[in-house]
């Protein structure tokens, strides 16, 4: 993997490196170490040229595609997904819907009740939903999504979360919806 450290130069100069090696050290003795100048003081060991080339190509692809086009595509997918998912009996989508649906990002957290559920029927457990969708070849995230206090406040143990991006299609959303319905019919 690869990451990017971006920050104000004055703060980066004051920050100590978190690991050592390679060209990040200017001089070293038993008594003292002098770190190299920016950006080298944060580059321990041999740079990962393959990963940096891959990152450069990925950024180039994003720029060629256009961030506005990507945002438009994700927005269309999200609206399509919300509309399709709302048609599912017993579906509860977390986040803005209705007239505020345009405020929803390309991440949809949801829970769903079994078919024929009453208002008091519990929702299908998010881990059951996620595991069974996985068996159908559909990837969703389940759990509290590093937001356990929010889940507690909402009164839920966890949710299923579907995310959409540049490479997703409406057909994949249709597959997700059919998968949710199939899992729902098992309970």
Regions inferred by a protein language model and the residue ranges of each:
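Pyridoxal 5′-phosphate
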Residues: 1-187
């Amino acid at each position: 993997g690869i990451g990017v450290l971006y920050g104000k130069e004055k703060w980066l100069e004051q920050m100590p490196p978190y690991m050592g090696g390679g060209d990040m050290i200017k001089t070293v003795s038993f008594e003292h170490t002098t770190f190299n100048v920016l950006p080298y003081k944060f580059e321990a060991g041999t740079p990962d040229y393959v990963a940096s080339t891959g990152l450069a190509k990925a950024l180039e692809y994003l720029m060629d595609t256009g961030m506005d086009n990507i945002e438009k595509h994700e927005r269309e997918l999200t609206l399509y997904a919300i509309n399709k998912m709302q048609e599912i009996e017993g579906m509860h989508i977390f986040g803005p819907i209705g007239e505020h649906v345009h405020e929803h990002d390309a991440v949809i957290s949801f829970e769903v009740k079994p078919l024929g559920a009453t208002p008091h029927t519990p929702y299908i457990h998010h881990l059951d939903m996620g595991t069974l969708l996985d068996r159908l070849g559909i990837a969703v995230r389940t759990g509290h999504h590093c937001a356990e206090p929010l889940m507690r406040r909402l009164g839920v143990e966890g949710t299923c979360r579907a995310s959409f991006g540049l490479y997703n299609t409406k057909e994949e959303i249709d597959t997700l919806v059919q998968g949710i319905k199939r899992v729902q019919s098992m309970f």
